[in-house]
């Protein structure tokens, strides 16, 4: 069965068509600038055929029409017709407390996702637009919602509650939810396979280090704590997000800079993190280049980033009373040897030993610890699209 995986943003739509039996990516692409001038679809097949389609996309429905046209195109498509797509899997950012696993999309599911929009105003409305667009174009094809937050619904109360008046939780469901759950689950399960062990016997810490970054403690196969909170702003320093901060800083900046709360949160979400500290870029490649040139703020930034990751590893080792494996994944975790080296330099107390030769790897499965290391260190490339396809297949079946 071929499964179309959709990740819909407010002005973009990423897609992959995956053969759920072979798990091969048949085609993938991206629609950009939806609803604006200069909208474009970039499409690529497994055979290396490429297409760039510059067509007006006034809305996401038109974008989905163009995606289907690309997938079925005689020259650069990979299927003959819509009939060869068995199901659609949608990435949904926030499922709140309503969803602890993936769900078949029904009117009831859509209403529940809408009800979570207050918790993810930047993401859920866009995800819903993607669902409605696909329903309009692919009326009879079953669809599944896979939630970033679902994997973390196993966190105990002591891990997810904030020290705020309890009625705020009762009234507004203000608590820690966590994100990147699909990635953390995929990576932890694959790490257990790489180690040849049952995940139910392991304590694993997954470091998802990309432009967005989070750390998760996975004990016996379930998430017991994670670094992101009510929103993805909590936790690690990130590409443009500040991460953990004294909440009183918000009021302080508002007063000093004469900004509204919304404007200050925008700074913390979009102008902080690596971008804010370096003043150069949110892209780690640019930051590393600046480090090599001796840029002091870039050096401060990479050291701060690694330090924060190492602190969370220490916290989650305590939370689980030990750790068997530490995994590095996502853009930075998979591809930046020096970052892994910096983080590992803090792990001597765990008797975790990095093998410098094995660590010279990028974007592929690897055990990068020494044979004598008391804790396994791994590089495990994430594959959220494949994880979504697997969840979709589970619910839809053949």
Regions found by a protein language model. Give the residues of each.
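Glycine-rich phosphate-binding loop of actin/hexokinase-like ATP-binding domains
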Residues: 151-255
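Adenine-nucleotide phosphate-binding core of ATP-dependent small-molecule kinases
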Residues: 266, 273-277, 284-319
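Extreme N-terminal starter segment of soluble prokaryotic enzymes
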Residues: 1-4
């Amino acid at each position: 069965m071929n499964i179309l995986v959709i990740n819909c943003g407010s002005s973009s739509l990423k897609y992959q068509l995956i053969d759920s039996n072979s798990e091969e990516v048949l085609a993938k692409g991206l629609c950009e600038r939806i609803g604006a001038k200069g909208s474009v679809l970039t499409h690529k097949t497994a055979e290396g055929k490429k297409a760039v389609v510059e067509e007006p996309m006034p809305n996401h429905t038109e974008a989905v029409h163009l995606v289907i046209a690309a997938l079925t195109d005689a020259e650069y498509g990979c299927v003959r017709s819509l009939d060869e797509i068995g199901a659609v899997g949608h990435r949904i950012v926030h499922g709140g407390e309503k969803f602890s696993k993936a769900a078949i999309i029904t009117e009831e599911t859509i209403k529940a996702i809408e009800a979570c929009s207050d918790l993810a105003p930047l993401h859920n409305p866009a995800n819903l637009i993607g669902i409605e667009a696909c329903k309009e174009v692919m009326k009879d094809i079953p669809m599944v919602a896979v939630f970033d937050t679902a994997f973390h619904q196993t966190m105990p109360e002591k891990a997810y509650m904030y020290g705020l008046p309890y009625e705020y939780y009762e009234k507004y469901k203000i608590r820690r939810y966590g994100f990147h759950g699909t990635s953390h689950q995929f990576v932890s399960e694959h790490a257990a396979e790489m180690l040849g062990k049952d995940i139910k016997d392991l304590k694993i810490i997954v470091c998802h280090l990309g432009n967005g970054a989070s750390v998760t403690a996975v004990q016996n196969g379930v998430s017991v704590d994670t670094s992101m909170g009510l929103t993805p702003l909590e936790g690690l320093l990130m590409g443009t997000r500040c991460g953990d901060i004294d909440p009183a800083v918000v009021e302080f900046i508002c007063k000093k800079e004469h900004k509204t709360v919304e404007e200050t949160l925008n700074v913390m979400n979009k102008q902080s993190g690596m971008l804010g500290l370096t003043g150069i870029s949110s892209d780690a490649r640019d930051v590393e280049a600046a480090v090599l040139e001796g840029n002091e703020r870039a050096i401060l930034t990479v050291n701060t980033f690694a330090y924060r990751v190492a602190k969370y590893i220490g916290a989650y080792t305590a939370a689980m009373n030990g750790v068997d494996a530490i995994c590095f994944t996502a853009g930075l975790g998979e591809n930046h040897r020096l970052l892994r080296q910096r983080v590992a330099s803090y792990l001597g107390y765990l008797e975790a030993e990095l093998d410098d030769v094995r660590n010279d790897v990028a974007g592929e499965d690897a055990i990068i610890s020494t044979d004598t290391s008391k804790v396994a260190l791994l590089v495990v490339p994430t594959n959220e699209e494949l994880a979504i396809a697997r969840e979709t297949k589970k619910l839809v079946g053949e």
